[in-house]
Amino acid sequence: MDYEFLRDVTGRVLVRMSMGHEVVGHWFNEEVKDNLSLLDEVEQAARTVKGSERSWQRAGHEYTIWMDGEEVMIRANQLDFSGDEMEEGMSYYDEESLSLCGMEDFLRVVAAYREFVSKA
C-alpha cells in the first residue's frame, strides 16, 4: 500500500493512496483533516480489537471506518445506494468507494500521517 502526503497552497495536508486504496486517502482528506483526536480514537479501537473476535466502526460524514483484529475497511456512506433506484442497463461504479487493508499497514499510514502533520 503506497501513499504520499502533500500540502496544498493553503497548507492543508492531502493524502494520495495507491490504486485499490484510494478510499483510505479520501477518508484522511474528508474525515480526519486536522482532527488528530479521531486518529487517537482509531488507534485506541485498534488496540481493543487486535487479537480478539470483536469489531469496531465509526461512521463519519462521508466515510465509515470498520475494523476487526486483522483488517480495516473504509467505505463511502453513499454505498447504501439501492440497486432498485438504478435505471435499467445502468450499474453503480464503486471501486473507489471501498477499500480493505491490513491493520498493521493502516496503522503505519496513521503513524506516517501524524509525523508529516507534525512537521508543519
Swiss-Prot record:
This is UPF0231 protein YacL. It comes from Salmonella typhi. Belongs to the UPF0231 family. It comes from the Bacteria.
